[in-house]
A protein has these predicted regions:
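Structured secondary-structure scaffolds
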Residues: 1-46, 98-102, 154, 170-312
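N-terminal, positively charged nucleic-acid-binding surface of large information/translation enzymes
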Residues: 1-201
Length: 312
């Protein structure tokens, strides 16, 4: 009988959990409980997603450090889930030392295999704030659907992933000034090189895992439309440092590091409960992975995260 590894999407730590968070958590909790009742050895992990511009901007609004904000909201999340009697085996955090260790190790593996490239690109820079405007630090009109308040990384209206430079009429989220393009260096994961492995994995996993139809269609669209190298670094202060010469002062993009939180939280559980996390994450013949996510998170869980694991 295979063991069952269950995850629910890591909620952003910048606010109180909403119904969308609870639906995923409750669904995963019901499934994990059913698995245990049927005799499956089950590990259910979740935790707060703590890095990225969502946290930085919220901390700036409240006049506290990102670390202080994360500590406060992590406990709010944990208390709400305790009230709902969610039976996590571990509810962790992506700002933990073990998360940094595993993310950097995976990056080094990808880099050693030639799957990381360096590119100098133009990004939006705010002269007033004296910083590059990554992700939520810039808002503007979506070039795909025309939504007037799209974020720099993703349009909340149509769900399309974006680059900040694609926005029409961009504005700095902090001071509302109009940013200007400026050159900066970033690191990219070579998704086209991983595509054959990803396609093979997706064809098998989507059938065996009973993927929802929208997950299959969205993933196939990403692959069909052509995978491109994707930036995995950001010009931010709050995040996991990039362990590569020439990239001091940069951190990993939150959607590169966040899904790895499932692994690091399992590792934290293993340290507390006396098991090796690799027995859950590196034993596909004996472990089945079940992930409960929202539709906005599909490509990160079916393309970006598995590509990181397959490539490393």
């Amino acid at each position: 009988m295979k063991r069952r590894l269950v995850t629910s999407a890591l909620p952003y730590v910048n606010n109180v959990p909403h119904l969308g968070n609870l639906i995923q958590v409750l669904s995963a909790d019901v499934f994990a409980r059913a698995c245990r009742l049927r005799g499956y050895d089950t590990l259910y992990v979740c935790g707060t997603d703590e890095y990225g511009t969502a946290t930085e901007t919220k901390a700036q609004e409240e006049g506290v450090s990102p670390a202080e904000l994360c500590g406060r909201f992590h406990e709010i999340h944990a208390e709400i889930y305790r009230w709902f009697n969610i039976a996590f085996d571990k509810f962790g955090r992506t700002s933990s030392p073990v998360q940094t260790e595993i993310v950097q190790a995976l990056f080094r593996d990808l880099d050693a295999k030639g799957l990381i490239s360096e590119q100098t690109i133009e990004q939006l820079y705010c002269d007033s704030c004296e910083r590059f405007l990554a992700d939520r630090y810039v808002r503007g009109t979506c070039p795909h659907c025309g939504y007037a308040d799209a974020r720099g990384d993703q349009c909340e209206a149509c769900g399309k992933l974006l680059d900040p430079t694609e926005l029409k009429e961009p504005k700095c989220s902090s001071c509302q000034a109009t940013p200007k393009p400026r050159a900066t260096k970033h690191l990219y994961i070579d998704l086209p090189a991983i595509r054959p492995q990803l396609e093979s994995w997706m064809k098998e996993a989507s059938v065996k895992g009973f993927w929802a139809n929208n997950a299959i269609q969205m993933t196939q669209a990403w692959i069909r439309d052509g995978l491109k190298p994707r930036a995995i670094t950001r010009d931010l202060k709050w995040g996991i440092p990039v362990p590569k010469p020439g990239f001091e002062g940069k951190v990993f993009y939150v959607w590169f590091d966040a899904p790895i939180g499932y692994i690091s939280i399992a590792a934290a559980a293993g340290k507390e409960q006396g098991f090796d996390w690799r027995s859950w994450w590196q034993d596909p013949d004996n472990v089945e992975l079940y992930q409960f996510i929202g539709k906005d998170n599909i490509p990160f869980h079916t393309v970006i995260f598995p590509s990181t694991l397959l490539g490393s």
